[in-house]
């Protein structure tokens, strides 16, 4: 289901019919992966990346993920309407207020996922 949407029908067909191995850098170029980490610094880089995600506004990230998933099936007009609704919801969260205050106070935000 996902592979043709990520890499296109022709490439997905070739990969599935041939069983060819795909190296990480090639998978990244095809859009199958977001990021590839070097073997030498893998654990350090992965933990830094995970820490970055963990310190983001998780409520907003969840809403964004929901919108991305819905966008696969919505019409353009319906998606714009959904995004408007979600924007209003997101703006009422504690994390939104924290983000705005942190920006105005020139400090790093401390999001709570609320």
Question: Which positions does each model-derived feature cover?
Answer:
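CoA-thioester-processing core
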Residues: 1-17, 29-30, 45-49
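Interdomain hinge/lid region at the active-site interface
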Residues: 95-96, 102
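Transmembrane alpha-helical core positions of polytopic small-molecule transporters
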Residues: 17, 93-94
């Amino acid at each position: 289901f996902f592979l043709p949407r990520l890499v296109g029908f022709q490439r997905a067909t070739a990969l599935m019919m041939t069983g060819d191995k795909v190296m990480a850098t090639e998978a990244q170029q095809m859009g199958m992966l977001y990021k590839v980490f070097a073997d030498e610094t893998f654990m350090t880089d992965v933990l830094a990346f995970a820490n970055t995600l963990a310190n983001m506004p998780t409520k907003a990230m969840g809403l964004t993920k929901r919108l991305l998933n819905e966008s696969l099936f919505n019409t353009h007009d319906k998606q714009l309407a959904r995004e408007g609704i979600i924007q209003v919801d997101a703006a009422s969260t504690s994390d939104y207020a924290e983000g705005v205050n942190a920006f105005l106070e020139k400090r790093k935000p401390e999001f709570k996922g609320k």
